[in-house]
Amino acid sequence: MSAPRCIPVALMGLVLLGVGFPASTRPANRVAGVAGEGRVESELIADASLAGGRTWRTDPLTSRRGETDPALVTGLDGVVALSPPDTCLRVDIGHATVFRHQADRALIPASTQKVFVGDVALDRLGADHRFRTMVVGPGPVDGVVNGDLTLVGGGDPLLTTATYAFVRRTADQPLTFLDGLADSLVAAGVRRVTGRLVADESRYDTIRSVPSWPARYLSQNQVGPLGALTVDDGFRLDPIVPGSTAPPDRQKVDQPALHAADELLVLLRARGVTVDGGTALGVAPVGAGEVAAVQSAPLGEVVRQMLEESDNATAELLTKEIGVVAGTGGSTASGTASIRTRAAEMGVPVDQITFADGSGLDRGNRLTCDALTDVLERSGGPDGVIGSRLPVAGRSGTLENRFLGTPAQGRLKAKTGTLNGVTALAGFVTMTDGQTATFAYIANGDQAEDPRRGQDFLGVLLGQFETTCTDDTSEPMVIPLAGYAVRSVALGAVPVGALLVPAVASTLTALAAVPDTAVGGCTARAEGFSLDFGIGFQAGAGP
């Protein structure tokens, strides 16, 4: 019996997922372009370095390194097969690109775009940068401030009240509490203000959303009004209904800065401070002295929160701050222009990318898998400024409830992306042999079944793949089933080809001239082995 060798687990995934293909085509033959263009036959190539002299069929839009293990190649072909025509995929191992499918095709990236915002913010501002929200004006004399105090917004995206954090159950996030600013004013000796509490949001423009966003983004509260002085995400909580256990609803405010001043006024009154003139909008006087201030958590923690929770408001406000630092103003347009500049500095072809906003909500955004993979690698890899702050499969953020019980759990860290007709995933996987795979996957287009099945398959494939198989390598195979648990099924000594419908079984001709039987993560050219699908796969929602 010959020694075991790695196999494409993708094929068995195709079986259980019920994916069918015309008998004349292979899974890899899905063609890019306008939906409905269909598929085309790809040329047959014979590459001894790739397949040991076997004949492989390759998509002309897909390139593979000759020395890449055919198991991984076939598995990644399976990922493409599970995806709509408008899909890009790139996989690097050890900084060498091993698989590219339409990797230079510009597609809607959804929230994976946030990796660019995080990278630029950390590069331009530094991980230790803190946003500062100040109250300026005349100091108190015998507890009395004669005149106005001005609340100056510093762009803190996580400024909140303790009540809002409690109701929204976000207290575990790196929040900045407005309550602390009220405490600081009391500690500074303020007991009465004879004037007004003025709100200054002049650091950024007052465009409350991205003009090209659909109206439903605001009506569905996907993002609150944007501004340099925003508290509680720009929402006001409805009064709590006595006896109700449900959290109160929230309403979007029209003037976020004025709302912030109103909230501070409530907090001051609760501490015995009176403000004779109420609240108003305005700009702080030039040279006004600081009376009290509150600082955010370090930017590194803010970026982590943005990436883990896919926080749209944080991404948009960071984009405006990037514009301020660039010297071109606190607007979305200036921020996105600076992001493009940073991308060019990193060697990313800027003609392949379009930034209409910072969060990835806009359907006018365009990124390539090449661009995403490049920024992930050039920002320091899995332990770099972005990689170290990504959600981890089965543990944190938008991936906390995904890939549970699979080889990807704890090994995959990535940014998710989801819009109607868009699903994306980009990040890193620590493979079982210790090597790191960097990957980017974007799929655009409606899918009849679970839209995440392609990226789920990708994560599990990379999580359990070994670049070198040994005689004692035999791990349970895990197949993504679009969020449904898999019952344990024993398939005793059955050639893989016998399990497939004829159209899919034709793909096996690319593997060997003799039947192969799957055993864990490897195969042996022998009889008598069994296959156990004993591990369930669970997928979960994530932006």
Language-model segments: residues:
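A small/polar active-site loop signature that marks catalytic segments
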Residues: 234-384
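Small-residue-rich helix-loop
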Residues: 100, 319, 323-483
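Short, well-structured active-site flanking segments
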Residues: 123-138, 146, 276-280, 383-387
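Active-site SXXK
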Residues: 95, 109-127, 197, 229, ...
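Beta-lactamase-like hydrolase cores
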Residues: 38-106, 180-189, 193
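C-terminal region of N-terminal signal peptides and the immediate post-cleavage residues
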Residues: 17-56, 130, 272
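Short, gly/Ser/Thr-rich active-site loops of penicillin-recognizing serine hydrolases
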Residues: 457-536
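Mid-domain, small-residue-enriched loop/turn segments at the edges of structured enzyme/sensor domains
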Residues: 86-88, 144-227, 234, 273, ...
